[in-house]
Swiss-Prot record:
Family membership noted in the UniProt record: Belongs to the bacterial ribosomal protein bL31 family. Type A subfamily.
Protein name from the UniProt record: Large ribosomal subunit protein bL31
Cofactor binding annotation: Binds 1 zinc ion per subunit.
Functional summary from the UniProt entry: Binds the 23S rRNA.
Domain of life according to the entry: Bacteria
InterPro entries named among the record's database cross-references: Ribosomal_bL28/bL31-like_sf (IPR034704), Ribosomal_bL31 (IPR002150), Ribosomal_bL31_A (IPR027491), Ribosomal_bL31_sf (IPR042105)
Subunit details: Part of the 50S ribosomal subunit.
Residues reported to bind Zn(2+): C16, C18, C36, C39
GO molecular function: metal ion binding; rRNA binding; structural constituent of ribosome
PROSITE patterns, A to Z: RIBOSOMAL_L31 (PS01143)
Keyword Metal-binding in annotation: yes
One protein family per Pfam: Ribosomal_L31
Length: 67
């Protein structure tokens, strides 16, 4: 491989909007993100269920398609 053509690979501090921070390696020193595994609903178990049946009923009522 050629020398001096690759960017520097250094320790990167990743900071989330929720306040959580962790370190990884990257070519930048700091990285700010909006959501991480500490605050994402999938990882925290705070998922909300979508009520698809209610949406269908609302559509039918709106366009008078109910029987």
């Amino acid at each position: 491989m050629k020398k001096d053509i690759h960017p520097d690979y250094k320790v990167c501090t990743v900071t989330c909007a929720c306040g959580n921070s962790f370190e990884t390696k990257s070519n930048v020193e700091t990285l700010k993100i909006d959501i991480c595994s500490s605050c994402h609903p999938f990882f925290t178990g705070e998922q909300k269920l979508v009520d698809a049946a209610g949406r269908v009923e609302k559509f039918k009522a709106k366009y008078n398609m109910a029987k």
